[in-house]
Protein backbone atom coordinates (compact mmCIF):
# COMPACT_ATOMS: atom_id res chain seq x y z
CA UNK A 1 0.00 0.00 0.00
CA UNK A 2 1.41 3.39 -1.02
CA UNK A 3 1.90 6.16 1.51
CA UNK A 4 -0.46 9.12 1.25
CA UNK A 5 0.99 12.11 -0.58
CA UNK A 6 2.40 14.76 1.75
CA UNK A 7 1.13 18.28 1.16
CA UNK A 8 3.73 20.61 -0.33
CA UNK A 9 4.09 24.18 0.91
CA UNK A 10 3.38 26.80 -1.75
CA UNK A 11 3.89 30.57 -1.37
CA UNK A 12 3.00 31.85 -4.85
CA UNK A 13 -0.17 31.71 -6.91
CA UNK A 14 -0.24 33.16 -10.43
CA UNK A 15 -2.86 35.70 -11.36
CA UNK A 16 -3.27 33.98 -14.73
CA UNK A 17 -3.68 30.21 -14.71
CA UNK A 18 -4.37 29.30 -18.34
CA UNK A 19 -2.00 29.78 -21.28
CA UNK A 20 -2.81 28.90 -24.88
CA UNK A 21 -0.80 28.94 -28.10
CA UNK A 22 -1.64 31.93 -30.24
CA UNK A 23 -3.62 31.35 -33.42
CA UNK A 24 -5.11 27.96 -32.58
CA UNK A 25 -8.85 27.62 -32.06
CA UNK A 26 -9.58 26.61 -28.47
CA UNK A 27 -11.56 23.60 -29.66
CA UNK A 28 -8.42 22.19 -31.34
CA UNK A 29 -6.08 22.60 -28.37
CA UNK A 30 -5.10 19.84 -26.00
CA UNK A 31 -4.01 20.95 -22.55
CA UNK A 32 -1.36 20.00 -20.05
CA UNK A 33 -2.28 20.41 -16.39
CA UNK A 34 0.57 21.85 -14.35
CA UNK A 35 0.00 21.34 -10.63
CA UNK A 36 0.34 24.33 -8.32
CA UNK A 37 3.31 22.74 -6.53
CA UNK A 38 5.02 22.07 -9.88
CA UNK A 39 4.84 25.77 -10.73
CA UNK A 40 6.18 26.60 -7.26
CA UNK A 41 9.14 24.24 -7.78
CA UNK A 42 10.04 25.95 -11.07
CA UNK A 43 9.65 29.39 -9.48
CA UNK A 44 11.95 28.56 -6.57
CA UNK A 45 14.63 26.88 -8.68
CA UNK A 46 14.55 28.84 -11.94
CA UNK A 47 13.46 32.33 -10.85
CA UNK A 48 14.55 32.58 -7.20
CA UNK A 49 17.74 30.65 -8.08
CA UNK A 50 17.65 28.59 -4.87
CA UNK A 51 19.61 25.35 -4.68
CA UNK A 52 17.80 22.02 -4.43
CA UNK A 53 18.18 21.80 -0.64
CA UNK A 54 16.75 25.30 -0.12
CA UNK A 55 13.86 24.59 -2.49
CA UNK A 56 13.04 21.34 -0.72
CA UNK A 57 13.11 23.07 2.67
CA UNK A 58 10.80 25.86 1.49
CA UNK A 59 8.33 23.32 0.10
CA UNK A 60 8.72 21.07 3.17
CA UNK A 61 9.61 17.97 1.13
CA UNK A 62 12.70 15.81 0.69
CA UNK A 63 15.29 16.69 -1.96
CA UNK A 64 14.27 13.61 -3.96
CA UNK A 65 10.59 14.61 -3.86
CA UNK A 66 11.51 18.14 -4.93
CA UNK A 67 13.52 16.73 -7.85
CA UNK A 68 10.56 14.55 -8.88
CA UNK A 69 8.22 17.55 -8.75
CA UNK A 70 10.45 19.84 -10.82
CA UNK A 71 11.23 17.08 -13.35
CA UNK A 72 7.50 16.54 -13.88
CA UNK A 73 6.89 20.29 -14.21
CA UNK A 74 9.65 20.86 -16.74
CA UNK A 75 8.52 17.84 -18.75
CA UNK A 76 4.95 19.15 -18.95
CA UNK A 77 6.04 22.66 -19.96
CA UNK A 78 8.44 21.31 -22.60
CA UNK A 79 5.73 19.08 -24.10
CA UNK A 80 3.21 21.95 -24.13
CA UNK A 81 5.67 24.31 -25.83
CA UNK A 82 6.93 21.84 -28.44
CA UNK A 83 3.55 20.30 -29.25
CA UNK A 84 1.42 23.46 -29.13
CA UNK A 85 -0.67 22.50 -26.11
CA UNK A 86 -2.31 24.80 -23.59
CA UNK A 87 -1.03 24.94 -20.01
CA UNK A 88 -3.60 24.96 -17.22
CA UNK A 89 -2.32 25.56 -13.68
CA UNK A 90 -4.62 23.70 -11.33
CA UNK A 91 -4.84 21.18 -8.54
CA UNK A 92 -2.16 19.26 -6.76
CA UNK A 93 -1.29 18.39 -3.19
CA UNK A 94 -0.36 21.66 -1.57
CA UNK A 95 -0.93 23.87 1.44
CA UNK A 96 -0.31 27.59 1.70
CA UNK A 97 0.04 27.97 5.44
CA UNK A 98 -0.76 31.55 4.61
CA UNK A 99 -4.55 31.66 4.36
CA UNK A 100 -6.67 32.11 7.45
CA UNK A 101 -10.28 31.00 7.51
CA UNK A 102 -13.03 32.46 9.69
CA UNK A 103 -16.08 30.54 10.83
CA UNK A 104 -19.24 32.60 10.42
CA UNK A 105 -20.99 30.67 13.22
CA UNK A 106 -18.44 30.70 16.07
CA UNK A 107 -16.03 33.41 14.74
CA UNK A 108 -13.07 31.00 15.11
CA UNK A 109 -10.09 32.09 12.98
CA UNK A 110 -7.65 29.36 11.96
CA UNK A 111 -4.86 28.72 9.47
CA UNK A 112 -5.02 26.07 6.79
CA UNK A 113 -2.08 23.97 7.83
CA UNK A 114 -2.58 20.46 6.50
CA UNK A 115 -5.06 20.65 3.66
CA UNK A 116 -5.57 23.14 0.87
CA UNK A 117 -9.34 23.31 1.37
CA UNK A 118 -11.01 23.22 4.76
CA UNK A 119 -14.66 22.28 4.45
CA UNK A 120 -15.60 22.60 8.12
CA UNK A 121 -14.55 24.67 11.12
CA UNK A 122 -12.30 22.62 13.43
CA UNK A 123 -13.89 24.26 16.51
CA UNK A 124 -17.62 23.84 15.86
CA UNK A 125 -17.93 21.76 12.66
CA UNK A 126 -19.83 24.46 10.77
CA UNK A 127 -19.56 24.59 6.99
CA UNK A 128 -20.11 28.37 6.99
CA UNK A 129 -16.48 29.39 6.54
CA UNK A 130 -14.77 32.14 4.55
CA UNK A 131 -11.21 33.21 3.84
CA UNK A 132 -10.30 36.10 6.10
CA UNK A 133 -7.16 37.31 4.33
CA UNK A 134 -7.17 41.07 4.05
CA UNK A 135 -4.07 41.27 1.83
CA UNK A 136 -5.77 39.40 -1.03
CA UNK A 137 -2.82 36.99 -1.29
CA UNK A 138 -4.82 33.92 -2.20
CA UNK A 139 -7.18 35.60 -4.68
CA UNK A 140 -9.47 33.07 -6.35
CA UNK A 141 -7.37 30.06 -5.28
CA UNK A 142 -8.83 29.97 -1.80
CA UNK A 143 -12.20 28.34 -1.15
CA UNK A 144 -14.69 30.85 0.22
CA UNK A 145 -12.51 33.91 -0.41
CA UNK A 146 -14.08 37.21 0.67
CA UNK A 147 -13.90 39.75 -2.13
Swiss-Prot record:
* Family indicated by similarity: Belongs to the UPF0251 family.
Query: PANTHER family in the record, alphabetically?
Result: PTHR37478, UPF0251 PROTEIN TK0562
Please give the name of this protein: UPF0251 protein CTC_01373
